[in-house]
């Protein structure tokens, strides 16, 4: 099935193609690789993307985003893919912000999504615990505490987890690993006591 873009989406596609062609050539990715960049992306380029509104491309306008939805994000990411543009966009928007948008409370949406759209907060999703994709295999637990939840466990392969300010953690609040029920999304601040990240 072919995706037919409307006029606004075509304008977005053209703008994204122009930006990526002129600002993020493949040589930028090679430079990041050769320099063993700690971030994994060029921060100045990400700031330019934020200025274009791309940090809020799929976030609804009511939460400070552009409201282009996932089609708009897909259009931008397709053009980023043409030049292998390195950015935290997939982890922050495609994974983290999507979890908050579809699973977060209204208060969480109002508090966090405008910060994401403004480029102030980077997000990640912590799902995997084994070398194989087993979303129901989560053994990480979240127990109610005085300040919300206490999360115990570890995650692997967290895309952009090393740069995220906040991580959406898939944790078990009931049941056993393998059970389809009892999984909860818990928002964890990277600066919280006990949180460690290795790369």
Model-derived segments and their meaning:
Residues 9, 20, 53, 60, ...:
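Buried hydrophobic positions in well-ordered alpha/beta secondary-structure cores of metabolic enzymes
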Residues 87-107:
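N-terminal glycine-rich flavin-associated loop
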Residues 103-117:
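A generic, well-ordered mixed alpha/beta core segment in the N-terminal half of proteins
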Residues 152-196:
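A short core secondary-structure module
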């Amino acid at each position: 099935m072919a995706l037919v873009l409307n006029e606004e989406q075509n304008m977005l596609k053209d703008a994204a193609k122009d930006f990526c062609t002129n600002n993020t050539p493949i040589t930028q990715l090679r430079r990041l690789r050769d320099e063993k960049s700690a971030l994994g992306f060029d921060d100045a380029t990400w700031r330019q993307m934020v200025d274009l509104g791309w940090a809020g491309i799929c976030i609804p306008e009511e939460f400070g985003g552009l409201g282009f939805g996932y089609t708009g994000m897909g259009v931008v990411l397709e053009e980023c893919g043409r030049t292998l543009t390195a950015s935290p966009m997939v982890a922050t928007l495609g994974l983290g912000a999507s979890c908050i948008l579809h699973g977060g409370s209204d208060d969480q949406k109002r508090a966090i999504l405008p910060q994401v759209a403004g480029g102030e907060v980077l997000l990640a999703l912590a799902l995997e615990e084994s070398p194989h994709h087993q979303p129901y295999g989560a053994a990480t637990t979240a127990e109610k505490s005085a300040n919300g939840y206490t999360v115990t466990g570890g995650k692997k392969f967290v895309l952009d987890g090393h740069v995220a300010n906040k991580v959406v953690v898939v944790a078990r609040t009931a049941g056993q690993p393998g059970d389809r029920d009892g999984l909860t999304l818990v928002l964890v601040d990277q600066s919280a006591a006990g949180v460690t990240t290795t790369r």
